[in-house]
Amino acid sequence: MRSVRQIALVSCTVLVLTSVLWQQSIPESSQLDASLAAVLHKNHFTGRVQYSLQRRLGRSLNLELANLGRLLWFDTITGLNNDNTCGGCHSPTNGFGDTQSIAIGIENNGVVGPDRRGPRNMRRTPTVANSAFFPNLMWNSRFASLSGNPFDNSSGLRFPQPEGLTLSYLPHLLVAQAFIPPTERTEVAGFEFSGDNDAIRAEVLRRLNSISAYRTLFGQVFPEVHTGTSINFDMFGRAIAEFEFSLIFADAPLDRFARGDRNAMTAPQKRGALLFFGRAGCVSCHSVAGQSNEMFSDFKDHVAGTPQIAPRTTNNNFDGPQANEDFGLEEITGNPADRYKFRSSPLRNLSLQPAFFHNGSFSRLEDALRYHLNPREHAKHYSPAQQDLDSDLLGPTGPIEPVLQRLDPRLKQGTPLTPGEFDDLLAFLRQSLLDSRALPENLRSLVPPSVPSGRPVLQFQFTKKKRRTR
């Protein structure tokens, strides 16, 4: 009888304690929700940017045109070197970003994924997912809408020479940017064709116009082609851009929380969000308001103190006396004050990347974050080998001291976090900004089994596998 009473007493005690703890958790959870909601409101984050695309385009998506762009995206007919496509570097296996630390363009082995081989370019390929909302493009911001709005060409669309401002008549920055990749020697064009950019484009068009299947597809969305007009590069650019417009993946847990679903995020993710928008200071560069379009970038160029790595085999010319540096924005402006500056990376779907920073010098998000919180301290200990980079990237690193001397003032003092705070911030970055529609298994169907040219489609490695050294 006594043991029964003891059991009953213990049970009652457990119930009381559970009730007390549960009641205490309600205010804590509610306070966390209220704090995060207030912070998002202050930063003008609505979680609704994905719904604004058609309004800003002034029309609905043209699905036929987007599908044409998809076929072009994966067809090597658009590259004069005959071995790479847009999809070879902007891969659906990684959220339409790179599969590599530093991109591999021409002279590749026909594989897109961890086993891709070939000479390296200079930087990691940025994602095109959500790029419809980016006011400038590329790590050195070399393609930009001068109005700060990619949907507004009224102030001009700025490109390096020889294009300059000549593409400003096109309706969106992405339509204009589509004129460039076919002309990039190290990406798809190769070095055998001797003509200039216009001549390269003319040759791509000659190829497309010679394929009846492409003329039929273009004719379905451009009636003038159906009646005999040749395919032109405006049409090509519109098709590529329309496919990119379809790649909007901006419905992450944080978006759903902002729209009212308080259960969309875990408590650690919410605490991490408060750090991101608050004491950790991340939002000062990875901003969401105004022309940032909730993309987690101010789209400005900064010196982040990134370690300098260069591949053993490259088809690019690296900077510096030892050809192991990347001068970044200076390449475009010619101003030494812009040396080592790179555009703040948009952070949506960050966890789908296999590597981080402009040169993929980190293969693990937690290491990239730890470094970024205190570059001066962690630069002393950086080693490519510790990041499991491919063996062709394990050579001596470029000089770091001149990079640190130019470090953005916001990064000079470092940001101290407790281990728990670090884990919370990492959880926010890894999980709260990820739209599950961008996961590889949900994008696999976008790779066509065949393309109108009849050429073989590159081999995409959708199954996650361990990185192999070269």
Segments the model singles out, each with a brief description of its role:
Residues R5-Q6, L17-R470:
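Periplasmic c-type cytochrome electron-transfer domains
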Residues M1-S3:
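N-terminal secretory signal peptides that target proteins for export/translocation
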